[in-house]
Amino acid sequence: MLELNNKKNIAILFSGGVESTLLYYLTLKQTSSETNIKLFIIDRDNNPIERAFDLYNKLKILWNDTRTSLHILLIPETIPSHKKISNALNILNQEHDCVILGLNKYPSKKSIRPKLKGNTFNNTSILKMLNKFENLILPFIDLQKNQIIQMYYDYDIKEILQMTHSCGSPELKPCKICFNCRERIWAYNKLDKPLELGV
């Protein structure tokens, strides 16, 4: 899935969510011990930093990981939330062989998607913006959340799902009403598996 041959200096944008946690696992498994892997987190409206560090520290022990590190990537507060990712990519793209981002397709069910959004990124302003980063890897760009959750079962790491954080609100527990929670509920329903909303 990840084509990381000859990549010696890898950055992963990490939030502690379903996609970025799986990318952490896959990158660890598909690279050699000489590969330098750094995970970066940016602060957002749902305050992910504390949860992401908590998850990372647990996984580092569970996966016997001695190769990675997690860093807070400081983005100026003057930059609006919807531009923070592109700002982070600008910084990381200059310093790494590749940057891995867990962007995935929106659900096929229209009522779940954010208003006026299709379920692919073809010919969208987001994809045009991302295409300018030559070192960017988007392994999940054509996959929906249910397909990504299924990979946790395929790789026999499904117990990690309960430790991930998807909720887009700053609440202490998953709110169940934001897009991120509704997408996760939709994905589990589609897979016909018991719902695990995470932390």
Which ranges hold each PLM region?
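Nucleotide-activated chemistry modules centered on ATP-dependent adenylation/adenylyltransferase
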Residues: M1-V199
